[in-house]
Amino acid sequence: MPLLSVKKLTENFDGLCANSNINMEINEGELVGLIGPNGAGKTTLFNMLTGVYVPSEGSIEFTKDDKPIKLNGIKPYKITALGLARTFQNIRLFKDMTVLENVLIAMNKDVDYGVITALLRLPKYYKSEIAMKKKAMELLTIFHLEDKCEELACNLPYGEQRRLEIARAMA
């Protein structure tokens, strides 16, 4: 069963066809590239896959825990929570936050405590925060940014900012 399945995906903007009849399957562990000239519809495809645009026609299915989930019409934040995330062509980091904070902020979907628990600093708050920090540091280690975890994102060179953005998307 494919991890991501796209069938007859089409997107029209007021009569302009940006994508037409796209079909593809991506299996777990595959690394796939999408190449094309400016204006070919690459970003439009990613916007449909991540819920920014609802396709004019066709279907998108993402498999999680061996269950296919139809993504058409699902809000982008819910698609991200399922595990399908994206980065953008332009870097969109929180420049005045640390490298670690940039990854942690992307983990807000994993917060399992309420405002009262956070305000009172109850044990559940600390347990959750420690688990998220551990996961964030694991991601930073994968992207060779663990030694920069306390640096402001704006102080990183461009290549490291891109890696941070990918780590944040994976959080």
Predicted regions and their residues:
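Conserved ABC ATPase "signature" region
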Residues: 115-148
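ABC ATPase NBD Q-loop/coupling interface
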Residues: 59-82, 120-125
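Helix-to-loop junction immediately C-terminal to a conserved catalytic motif
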Residues: 50
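The feature captures the beta-strand-to-loop junction immediately N-terminal to the Walker
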Residues: 35-37
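Hydrophobic anchor residue at the start of the ABC signature
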Residues: 166
